[in-house]
Amino acid sequence: MHFPLPQPDVSATFKRRLNRFLGVAEVEGEEALVHIHDPGRLAELLFPGSTVWLRKKAGGKAPYYLLAVELPEELVLVDSAMHNKIATWLVEEGHVFKGYSVAKTEPSYGRGRFDLLLRRPDGGLALVEVKGVTLEVGGVALFPDAPTARGARHMEELARAAAEGYEAHVLFLVLRRRARLFSPNWALDAKFAEALAKAADAGVKISAVKLEMFKWGLKFAGELPVKLR
């Protein structure tokens, strides 16, 4: 089984990024605005001349929505709106959290909203925060690729939940084919990395899985080792 992705409408050549959510691509010989849902920098993916796959978008400033980037050796999903659906599929297929089921999406806890609330086989509940990883350097998948104060706050909330006796998880979806290991990006965002490591010390369970993209779907490619420090 694989996770089906929406069929893109057109391939294009990326030209430049305007801001966090907008870029410009050349589509069939003309420049067009593209909505970018992933807030990361994506500098190693979205550079002038890179091949991108777009979906047509109804309404809003941009007529296109960025789905994926095509590199010489791989396709990389860059639509972060898909992450919760992918994580739900992984649970339902038994690839992660075997025996658990999805009780709720986007549950609230404390001052934060998380991605999934799972029900354990014994009826208990588990909070899960899902993060997508598109940065890979020398076989190491790194998160984040841009500083994320919100991400650090999520880790602190999960640590509090674990300290109060709740089961809590962080699941990293690694979307790079060559990745062999996951690590927080200490060089770029030490605050997030430290918050993640402290969350693990508090009892939050950290895991990473690799997903390989093809036209047009994702296949589960196994768990990756995690190195926090």
UniProtKB/Swiss-Prot annotation:
InterPro entries the record matches: SfsA, SfsA_C, SfsA_N
Gene3D superfamilies in alphabetical order: 2.40.50.580, 3.40.1350.60
GO MF, one example: DNA binding
Similarity comment: Belongs to the SfsA family.
NCBIfam families: sfsA
Cited PANTHER family: SUGAR FERMENTATION STIMULATION PROTEIN A
Name of the molecule in the record: Sugar fermentation stimulation protein homolog
Originating species: Pyrobaculum calidifontis (strain DSM 21063 / JCM 11548 / VA1)
